[in-house]
């Protein structure tokens, strides 16, 4: 059965994303897959298949799929910078929900080191969105795709997370926003809902939905639900912020 034919029938329990409630996540994901199936097939399903940043990886981030607008010069920088990145410190299947910022020298800290390997040396016009779209393909359960839309959508929650974490870990008190932690808290708070969502998608009879249920991370499903919670076009200008 096709995606459109199953949309009206699917139902799963509500999930909150950055304080916004998606009342029928299964329908929202089916709608996303209907509208952006090419992105899922040509970008998401290539995640975790690369051992290094390559030309093929960069091409997957560009239009018509993710619209990263990474130039040839920037692509060369990503590829070169990737050769010295600390990939070995982070398992391929690392999950954001395990990246507790209060755990010193834990997954959060290792992910931050990997992020900063690119962030601290970035050339002009390479900022949060471009880096996150590349790192997502290398570690899809860990790095959110922080384009300008998702950054704005999570801003209030990220500020609250920063205040809370900063009060408990002095080394992180300097940050005004912690987007990773805000998203991580939503994943932890929605584990049951996400599990049911996967079960529903897996029984739709729609091949793309069934593959999505098996292959997409909780992080990416939540990203898709963010669009359903507050639909609209993102500002196309990448924002230069540190998202961790």
Give the ranges of each region predicted by the language model:
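An N-terminal alpha-helical hairpin/helix-loop-helix interaction module that forms a charged
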Residues: 1-122, 140-244
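Short linear interaction motifs
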Residues: 111, 131-132
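Hydrophobic, aromatic-enriched interface-forming segments
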Residues: 132-138
